């Protein structure tokens, strides 16, 4: 694996961690605290 490819993969993983984790945590938090039943 070339250094540029490994750097690209690490940046993609970092972006996923920075973006997806807070959004999923917020969705789980809202879904657990929101008591409105949706059909």
UniProtKB/Swiss-Prot annotation:
InterPro entries: PSII_PsbX (IPR009518), PSII_PsbX_type_1_subfam (IPR023431). The keyword Protein biosynthesis does not apply. It is found in: Plastid, Chloroplast thylakoid membrane. Signal peptide: none annotated. Pfam families: PsbX. The keyword Transmembrane helix applies. GO terms for biological process: photosynthesis. It is a single-pass membrane protein. GO terms for cellular component: chloroplast thylakoid membrane; photosystem II. The chain crosses the membrane at residues 12-32. Keywords: Chloroplast, Membrane, Photosynthesis, Photosystem II, Plastid, Thylakoid, Transmembrane, Transmembrane helix. PSII is composed of 1 copy each of membrane proteins PsbA, PsbB, PsbC, PsbD, PsbE, PsbF, PsbH, PsbI, PsbJ, PsbK, PsbL, PsbM, PsbT, PsbX, PsbY, PsbZ, Psb30/Ycf12, at least 3 peripheral proteins of the oxygen-evolving complex and a large number of cofactors. It forms dimeric complexes. Belongs to the PsbX family. Type 1 subfamily. Involved in the binding and/or turnover of quinones at the Q(B) site of photosystem II (PSII). PSII is a light-driven water plastoquinone oxidoreductase, using light energy to abstract electrons from H(2)O, generating a proton gradient subsequently used for ATP formation. This is Photosystem II reaction center protein X. It comes from Emiliania huxleyi. The gene is psbX.
